Amino acid sequence: MRRREREVVEPNEIRDIIEACKVCRLGFCEEGEVYIVPVNFGYDMKGKELTLYIHCAGEGRKIDLIRKNAKVGIEMDCHHELAEGDLACQYSYYYASLIGNGHAKIVEETYKKKEALGKIMEHQTGKIFDESEMNPKLVELSLIHI
């Protein structure tokens, strides 16, 4: 990051940004072409180690791209605020963001899918759902771990 004084490195500050975001942009690269898709997510954070969970269909472009190249980029942003000025060039925009890289893998084990779906639902709704409240057909769809 060019402006080091603005870099967020403290785990609690990173967690605050993640908590405020409900959408993450997931970026892939294939044969020189970039593909970015917004997705809902859940997460787990232990110390400085962040794991993202994304639910998706069992087939499609995301799954195909992960199978070809598991390297991904992520971006999420929140706390948007326009800073007004008297002149056009005095305007600015404030926001908090998280940008990173990782390796995506497709989760195969049903029990891991259920755990990850629980993380997604907890992050998106603020509620903890019992396993019995999960649709078995949805559990069998793909889940991505980053």
What are the residue ranges of the model-derived segments?
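A generic structural signal for nonpolar/aromatic side chains embedded in well-ordered alpha-helices
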Residues: I18, L65-I66, I120
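Short, structured loop/turn "capping" segments at alpha-beta junctions
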Residues: G126-E131
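Conserved small/polar residues in nucleotide/adenosyl-binding loops
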Residues: I144-I146
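Extreme N-terminal tail/first-helix region
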Residues: M1-E19
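Short, structured beta-strand-loop surface elements
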Residues: E59-A116
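Short amphipathic C-terminal alpha-helix that caps PH/PH-like domains
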Residues: K113-T125
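Basic, polyanion-binding surface patches
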Residues: E133-V139
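Short beta-strand segments
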Residues: C21-G58
